[in-house]
Amino acid sequence: MIVRAQHCCAPTGKPIMPYKITLLPGDGIGPEVIACAEQVLRVLPLEFEFTRAEIGFDAYERLGTPLPDATLQSIRSSHAALFGAVTTPPNLPGYFSPVVRMRQKLDLYANLRPIRSTPHPSSRPGIDLLIVRENTEGLYSGLERLEDDGNRAITERVITRKGSERIIRKAFDLARQTGRKKAHVVHKANVLRQTCGLFRAVALEIAREYPEIEMLEMLVDTCAMELVRAPEQFEVIVTTNLFGDILSDEACMFVGGLGVAASGNIGTAAAVFEPVHGSAPPLVGTGKANPTATFLATAMMLEHLGETEQASRLRNAVESCIAAGQVTPDLGGALTTDGMTRKVIGILG
């Protein structure tokens, strides 16, 4: 399906190629929030080609797999993808996490979680943090097994030099590009001496290449505590997969919660952007699904495409809605999902 926005030129008048975007609605409220993002993209002065692809539990029930090969191919052939949410039932034979598998198959090695203060009353001021999480190895490598007749469960933690080098370099590059002056390398090398030890050693090597950026290291338990005590002290955090997963969800609670948390999964040949929240089955069809995180993920996607002006416009429109209380009930407002979408579109003009 090809959807062309009203204008086919950028605001500068420079012609652009249509951006090929794969939409991954998924399960639960995923289709609802992705539909909202598509509506917003339609009103921007850009040109898009949208393709919908299957992912998640609904795909598994109909196709026998939660991540069809056709979905991976669609993402590979697109400039970027927008993902909604999936339902992952535990202990279902033949079912695997399509999100983890997608990250591995497409080598989406960097998970970027911007944590910024919002105009919401629950948001703490002065926070502008980027968490850079290794996205393809660690304890999420998928190497699990049962032994001793099911009485012992083992998960292998894989940390490689290559994986550590590229995620740490990505974090320091982003710090340099965004004018940040310090980066915290978070690990648990005092206990996990081999895996975190390698990650830490690589960080110390790479940090020498960025003399203008102060490298600080912090144990993960200390970091969790410091995020509660003084989150504004952090500018960039780079860490391994599981640690980053936990810390980023913790940090987003200081700026409004999961309803405003967006994420980017970046590789060398593909990029997938998503809201962090889950599929929220009880909210399906109620009009209460919060599209804010999906809008912010869409802004991240626009930045990735080089459309920084349109990304800023969208982000500012969302923040204007938050400041005015024109939001969904989970953020203290009274708007429906579609109602908030219309407000954002109205601001964008």
Task: Label every PLM stretch briefly.
Residues 8-10:
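Short, low-complexity intrinsically disordered segments enriched in A/P/G/S/L with frequent Arg
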Residues 17-21:
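Extreme N-terminal starter segment of soluble prokaryotic enzymes
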Residues 47-70, 225-227:
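N-terminal beta-loop-helix "entrance" segment that forms/cooperates
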